[in-house]
A protein has these predicted regions:
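Active-site phosphate-binding and catalytic loops of NTP-dependent enzymes
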Residues: 4-7, 72, 105, 141-148
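Conserved P-loop NTPase nucleotide-binding/switch module
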Residues: 76-121, 127-135
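Extended helical scaffolds that flank P-loop GTPase cores
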Residues: 182-210
Length: 210
């Protein structure tokens, strides 16, 4: 809505199974139609790349550039702790994670916390997410020697992507838009707050008392 005349391309990589050689293009299944003619989405199998990206992803990006797309998003098939292949072909990189990363010491092993332009903690409504956000911020400060930077100024954003008009997602877009020169409206509301009839801490109440 902030850039109605811009053309956006989504290139989504899905993993290929070694045993069968096939790939379930799940993003294509969920997005079988797009409501805007300025949006294009293509699923790509990783095939034999041995990586979280396809061996042909860089060529797909060049084709998208050649036909005039203004912004190209590339989604990996999932990333390991020591992987950062996407940073070699993308101008800007986002690392999206949840609070289920295990012990805080596991953060030491995640390469993308060193190199990603933006780090996103999604599903922030889940229990333990606030502790996870503090741990991620501490790790980013250590990795990048940013001890003098306030927590709110770090390239770490908390989101609830499943929530309509989530302020965290709007704040993430604002940060990304600043980097790539796009327009972005001001986020409205408090980041990380789940809207709904049932408070987050009571969502699993019936299961807990059963």
């Amino acid at each position: 809505r902030d850039n109605p005349h811009k053309k956006i391309c989504l290139l989504c990589v899905d993993p290929t199974r070694k045993r069968t050689g096939g790939a379930l293009l799940g993003d294509r299944i969920r997005m079988n139609s797009l409501a805007d003619n300025n949006l294009f989405m293509r699923s790509i199998a990783s095939r034999g790349s041995g990586s979280e990206i396809s061996a042909n992803l860089d060529r797909a990006i060049e084709v998208a550039k050649a036909v005039g797309f203004d912004l190209i998003f590339c989604e990996t098939s999932g990333i390991g702790q020591g992987s950062d292949a996407i940073t070699k072909i993308a101008d800007h990189s986002l690392y999206i994670m949840t609070a289920e990363f295990g012990a805080h010491s596991q953060l030491e092993k995640i390469e993308m916390l060193d190199v990603a332009d933006l780090i996103v903690l999604n599903k922030f409504e889940k229990r333990g997410s606030e502790d996870a956000l503090r741990a991620i911020r501490k790790q980013v400060k250590r990795n990048r020697n940013l001890f003098h930077v306030a927590d709110e100024e770090l390239p770490v954003v908390a989101t609830i992507a499943s929530q309509f008009a989530d302020p965290g997602v709007d704040f993430l877009w604002q940060k990304l838009a600043d980097e790539i020169g796009f327009n972005a409206s001001e986020p409205f509301g408090q980041v990380g707050v789940r809207k709904g009839v049932i408070p987050p801490e009571r969502v699993h109440y019936l299961a807990e008392i059963a």
